[in-house]
Structure formats: structure tokens, C-alpha cells
Amino acid sequence: MLERYANEEMKALWNEQTKFETYLEVEKAVVRAWNKLGQIQDSDCEKICAKAAFNLERIKEIEKTTKHDLIAFTTCVAESLGEESRFFHYGITSSDCIDTAMALLMTKSLKLIQKGVKNLYETLKNRALEHKDTLMVGRSHGVFGEPITFGLVLALFADEIKRHLKALDLTMEFISVGAISGAMGNFAHAPLELEELACEFLGLKTANISNQVIQRDRYARLACDLALLASSCEKIAVNIRHLQRSEVYEVEEAFSTGQKGSSAMPHKRNPILSENITGLCRVIRSFTTPMLENVALWHERDMSHSSVERFALPDLFITSDFMLSRLNSVIKNLVVYPKNMLKNLALSGGLVFSQRVLLELPKKGLSREESYSIVQENAMKIWEVLQQGAFKNTDENLFLNALLNDERLKKYLSEDEIKACFDYNYYTKNVGAIFKRVFE
């Protein structure tokens, strides 16, 4: 975890102090459960819950000998207690404590992620509504296609982010699960009721079945969901980067007073935040393979998953949280240039209306193949003009004029009918209906 890419609230969940505090919370829940089952006296339960404490430095010191951080933890806590310490960590195994504590930490962390996703969705929605009717050219393969609105672009992003909210709700069900089932998961030394009570105290569900550990398909699902979320965020960031290119310049990341874009070129204003988000997304996705490989543990459990999770889980949550907040800020403060969008629309010389003309001809009795041939032939002439660099913004009617002078077209379409094809409103007439689908 790098401090540079961490928000304080999420970072506070993933440190040694919080980890052992959560272990202690689980251990106390187990003590309370034993007490409720009549196996530990009230006085011992009260003493443990009131007095149990640990010291990080002491845990590290003990671990030098034990080579086992959970045993170092329980030994340290026992030193803070009296005779009642005999009931601390009673009847359970290390993974009962560790995995149940991890469920608590992941649940809290995922709630922060969900909050970040909701914030991003609302920001995208608000900006989409703001630019619902802001005309721009749509591009496929990076090449001009047909007129759309910037609002549609943002609405598409918003709808995708909304799908992640649904997916994360399901993932929350999978990870908010504790297990207090003993060394082999067969409840040999503690009844099922102990697990049920302890998890109830902690606000967790119980796993239907476990072995020594909670099964890692749950963790892998989380990693994959966060990777998918990152890919969607990268998609937004990459599009912003393309739209900020100098020759496009339809949007721009906010550029603050005193900000610098280059140590050598004073004129530079770069989409550095979107580029940063793109890089963070690569890091997030990189954890999916080891987390998926953690699913296949030997028999009732081996240790191969532990080292992966010590890296992956903190970094997955911290980086995802930072990515979401940064992207939300980028979208919220994004500068949009509608005039440049209109200017770029005009740069096609009217070619963006080609399909409209194509669809009118078959209505007049011409075959689709011949219609396509006539329209494409005229379009290619305009491409040649564009390729030569002789085009001016005042030539946005190049394609229209070429069609009006084509004798073959005149047999099927009147001048007014051809001109009627060059209407931006035709391409935006369903924007309201689309927005209703997405946002209502």
C-alpha cells in the first residue's frame, strides 16, 4: 500500500492495530457465546471482555519465538488477564478467529467501496443530465460515426456503474460470513450453537459448512468484482484521455492555478488523473490471478493463501477506494467544450449523415445494394478532400452538395428530401426515452 494512493478511512481498516483489534472483537464474541451456552461463568466472561488487551510491540516480540502471529496475539492477551485467560481462545482454531475477523474487515471495506460506487453513479447521472442535449460526434474504431450527445456517453457510463452496485450487493452476501467450526470444520470441540451465537454478536451470517477455513471462492469473487469495477472505471478514464487530445479537445480535466504539466514544456495541460486511474486499474486487476489460485487449497487447508491475502486484500480495497474517489472528482470537475464538439461534428463535411440518406433511397424503390453504392461513392469523394487537408469548417456541407449534384439521386429524392436528411434532431429524438430507461 502506498500512502500516495490511499484514503484515510479505508487505510485505517488495513493496519496491524486494526487487525488485532478485530481479532480481539472475535475472541470476545466467542467468550460471550460460551457464556451464553453456560460453559463460562459470568464473572470470567466479564473479566475477559473488560480486561483483555494487547500490545503490538509485545506481539512482535513473542512472534519471534512462536513464528505464528495468532499465537503471539493470544499469548499477549493472556498476559493481560488472570486465571480467566484459560477461557480465551477456548475450543477454536486460529482460522476461526482470523477468517471471521477478515469477514468483518472485508464487510466494512466493501461498504466503503459501495459508498464510492454510489457517489460515482450520482456524479455521472448529474453530469449526464447536464449534457443530455450537448451534441457531439459518435466514434467507432476512433473514426467519426453519427451524431450523439455527450449526455448519452455519460449515461452509458452511469448505467454500467449501476450494474456494479447490484453485483457488489451479492458479493457482500458471500463475504459477510464467519466460521467458528474448529480445526477441521467438524465442530468436534465446540457446538454449532457457539458459531451461530458468536456470528450473531458480530453481525455476520454463518457459513453453511467450512473446513479449517472459510472457502476462498468467496474472496475470489470479491477480487473479480473489484477487477470488473476497475475495468469500467478505466473505460471512463480512457475515453476522457482520448477526448482531451489536442486535436479533439472536447473535454478537459480541471487544471488548477499553479499546476504544472511538464518540467520542459510550460504549455502542457495533461489528463494526468485519468492516466493515473488507468494505471491503478491495472494494479487492481493484477490480483485476480493469485486470488483465483487461492481457491484450490489442499484438503482441509494449507497456508499458500495467507501470503497472497496479506498483499492482495489491503491493496485491492485501498486502491479501489482511491480509484473511485479520484474518478468521481475527475467527472465532477470535468470541463466540457460544446463548441469544440460542434466544430468536430462539422469536420466530417456532413459524412455523419450518410446512413440517413442510405435509408431513404430504398423507400423510393431503389435496391439497398445500389443505394449503398451511390451514397458510398459520394462519401469517398469527400474523404479524398479530407485526406488532402483542403477542408475548412465552412465546408461542412460538402457531402450535401455532392449528393445534390448527383443525377442518379435526383431520380429518387428531391432537393428538400435530401436536405431533410441533414438534421441533427433526427439523431437525438430518442435521447429523452433512453434517459428515462437509465435513470427512472
Swiss-Prot record:
Superkingdom: Bacteria
GO biological process: 'de novo' AMP biosynthetic process; 'de novo' IMP biosynthetic process
GO cellular component: cytosol
Residues forming the catalytic site: H141 (proton donor/acceptor), S262 (proton donor/acceptor)
Pathway: Purine metabolism; AMP biosynthesis via de novo pathway; AMP from IMP: step 2/2; Purine metabolism; IMP biosynthesis via de novo pathway; 5-amino-1-(5-phospho-D-ribosyl)imidazole-4-carboxamide from 5-amino-1-(5-phospho-D-ribosyl)imidazole-4-carboxylate: step 2/2
Keyword terms of this UniProt record: Lyase, Purine biosynthesis
GO molecular function: (S)-2-(5-amino-1-(5-phospho-D-ribosyl)imidazole-4-carboxamido) succinate lyase (fumarate-forming) activity; N6-(1,2-dicarboxyethyl)AMP AMP-lyase (fumarate-forming) activity
Residues at which N(6)-(1,2-dicarboxyethyl)-AMP binds: 4-5, 67-69, 93-94, 212, 263, 268-270, 276, 307-311
E.C. no: 4.3.2.2
Catalyzed chemical reaction(s): N(6)-(1,2-dicarboxyethyl)-AMP = fumarate + AMP; (2S)-2-[5-amino-1-(5-phospho-beta-D-ribosyl)imidazole-4-carboxamido]succinate = 5-amino-1-(5-phospho-beta-D-ribosyl)imidazole-4-carboxamide + fumarate
Family (UniProt): Belongs to the lyase 1 family. Adenylosuccinate lyase subfamily.
Function: Catalyzes two reactions in de novo purine nucleotide biosynthesis. Catalyzes the breakdown of 5-aminoimidazole- (N-succinylocarboxamide) ribotide (SAICAR or 2-[5-amino-1-(5-phospho-beta-D-ribosyl)imidazole-4-carboxamido]succinate) to 5-aminoimidazole-4-carboxamide ribotide (AICAR or 5-amino-1-(5-phospho-beta-D-ribosyl)imidazole-4-carboxamide) and fumarate, and of adenylosuccinate (ADS or N(6)-(1,2-dicarboxyethyl)-AMP) to adenosine monophosphate (AMP) and fumarate.
Subunit architecture: Homotetramer. Residues from neighboring subunits contribute catalytic and substrate-binding residues to each active site.
Listed name of the protein: Adenylosuccinate lyase
Native species: Helicobacter pylori (strain ATCC 700392 / 26695) (Campylobacter pylori)
